[in-house]
Design a protein with these regions (language model features):
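Conserved alpha-helix/loop element of class I SAM-dependent methyltransferases that forms part
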Residues: 1-8
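Conserved class I S-adenosyl-L-methionine
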Residues: 8-15
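Class I SAM-dependent methyltransferase SAM/SAH-binding core
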Residues: 18-63
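A short acidic, Gly/Pro-enriched loop at the edge of an enzyme's catalytic core
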Residues: 62-72
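A short SAM/SAH-binding and catalytic strip from SAM-dependent methyltransferases
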Residues: 71-87
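A short glycine-rich, Lys/Arg-flanked "PGG" loop and its adjoining helix->strand segment in the class I
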Residues: 90-102
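SAM-dependent methyltransferase
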Residues: 107-178
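C-terminal lobe and adjacent flexible extensions of AdoMet/dcAdoMet transferase-like proteins
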Residues: 170-210
Length: 210
């Protein structure tokens, strides 16, 4: 899908990380530029074959500009939720639009908020339990703040860490896109273009710049 949207143009990845998406996309002949705040993640990208063909700028993808225009910009695997305020998420859409050529597309892959799975009267949703780790998510419906809670077990010891997110609804993303001068072109449940329904637990959405 991303290669098709890029066509003969260039692709911009917000949160390029270790290159899980960028490397195969670059391998298909699409020029890719990435933005990421983590130098450690980019170092892991640079250790992989083919990474020399990918340009990377260190910075916050919600605000960092690069001196190029692109046919497609994309942000995958729930990374929009790493921006923990609505203002930052709105800024991300504006930044994507500024980098896109007219007719270019911004693609986001994100989960649908799981609030309906919460037990009545509770704010914590168990997500994964195994002998090696526990994962749970807590939600604040008033602020859309969300925290991931992770426990990793090594022998008799457990290490706990937490990570903040902001969950966001598909319709809210559509409004952010409109504020940035883009309109919804397509929305699917997954990269295979499965139709998006009320039962879908994630979405891949494409907005087009006017």
């Amino acid at each position: 899908m991303l290669a098709g949207l890029a066509g003969s143009g260039r692709a911009l990845e917000f949160g390029i990380g270790t290159g899980r998406i960028a490397l195969p996309l670059s391998g298909r002949g699409v020029p890719v530029h990435g933005i990421d705040l983590s130098r450690a993640m980019v170092a892991r990208l640079r250790a992989k074959p083919g990474s020399d063909a990918i340009a990377v700028t260190i910075g916050d993808f919600a605000t960092t500009r690069v001196d190029s225009s692109f046919s497609v910009a994309y942000l995958v695997f729930n990374t929009i939720m790493n921006l923990t305020s609505q203002d930052a998420q709105v800024a991300c859409f504006g930044n994507a639009a500024r980098h896109l050529e007219p007719g270019g597309c911004f693609v986001i892959e994100c989960r649908v908020p799981e609030l309906r799975r919460l037990p009545p009267g509770q704010s914590v949703l168990p997500w994964h339990v195994s002998e090696e780790n526990w994962v749970a998510y807590s939600y604040d419906p008033a602020t859309q703040a969300m925290h991931g809670h992770y426990v990793e077990f090594t022998g008799d010891q457990g290490e706990y860490r937490t990570m903040p997110f902001r969950y966001v609804w598909p319709s809210e993303l559509d409004l952010m896109a409109r504020l940035a001068g883009m309109r919804l072109r397509d929305r699917w449940e997954d990269w295979d273009r499965t139709p998006f329904t009320g039962d879908s637990r994630k979405h891949v959405s494409v907005w087009e710049k006017a």
